[in-house]
């Protein structure tokens, strides 16, 4: 996952230390951190962490994280990635490494694109072709899930979800994909708890700030 922590100040040694994004906590400047959380024996652990610089691509970040897992001897059964990683370069990286995954497909615009998957009457499995002017086309397996919930979703109590997937057993039904992906929601809890225990500093040094984030995740793991 990728998280941005608001930063009020100037860069320490290089402008790449600061990422600009949507305003939060009175600033558009952030320090970025990428991490990997795993679930083992029904317990969640953060096992990899790195600082993210301005201009780094999602593909670079994902490749580094999986290389890190390999270097420390951790193998994964399936990766659950945030929709922010859903792009042709990242998907190609996952396919090339033969990684099984479930990843939401971002829905943009009012028609066309991923929204075409929502024209059916019920959930189903299909394929989808991503088109990138820079990185070309890529065909992936996809699952469209129609969820019903009284008073929870708009549009007469229904809402569609779309996922790019790889390596799913044939017996897995679309609604099960939705439930499987919900397993990653605990990542948000880990970041929230990390921020609760993270020591604050006035230092502009990104190495020190990365250390404090890492120590906070260690406390989370121990807890």
Range-by-range predicted roles:
Residues 200-223:
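Basic, amphipathic alpha-helical segments enriched in Lys/Arg and hydrophobic/aromatic residues
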Residues 9-11, 87-94, 112-116:
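A short acidic (Asp/Glu
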Residues 67-71, 91-100:
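Short, surface-exposed basic-aromatic patches at helix termini and helix-loop junctions that form
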Residues 1-6, 36, 76-86, 101, ...:
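Short, conserved catalytic/metal-binding motifs centered on acidic residues
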Residues 97-189, 193-194:
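An anionic, glycine-rich sequence signature occurring as long contiguous blocks
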Residues 50-72:
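Active-site beta-loop-alpha junctions of metal-dependent nucleic acid enzymes
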């Amino acid at each position: 996952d990728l998280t941005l922590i608001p930063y009020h100040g100037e860069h320490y040694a290089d402008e790449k230390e600061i990422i600009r994004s949507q305003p939060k906590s009175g600033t558009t400047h952030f320090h970025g951190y990428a991490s990997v959380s795993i679930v083992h024996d029904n317990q969640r652990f953060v096992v990899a962490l790195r600082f993210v610089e301005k201009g780094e691509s999602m593909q670079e970040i994902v490749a580094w994280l999986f290389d890190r897992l390999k270097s420390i001897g951790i193998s994964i059964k399936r990766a659950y990635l945030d929709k922010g990683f859903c792009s042709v370069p990242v998907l190609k990286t996952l396919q090339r490494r033969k990684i099984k995954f479930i990843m939401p497909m971002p829905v943009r615009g009012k028609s066309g694109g991923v929204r075409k998957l929502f024209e059916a009457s019920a959930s189903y499995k299909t394929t989808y072709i991503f088109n990138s002017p820079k990185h070309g086309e890529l065909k992936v397996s996809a699952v469209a899930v129609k969820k019903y919930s009284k008073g929870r979703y708009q549009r007469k109590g229904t809402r569609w979800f779309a996922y790019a997937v790889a390596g799913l057993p044939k017996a897995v039904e679309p609604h099960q994909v939705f439930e499987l992906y919900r397993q990653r929601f605990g990542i948000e809890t880990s970041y929230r708890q990390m921020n609760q225990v993270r020591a604050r500093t006035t230092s502009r040094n990104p190495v020190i700030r990365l250390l404090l984030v890492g120590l906070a995740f260690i406390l989370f793991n121990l807890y």
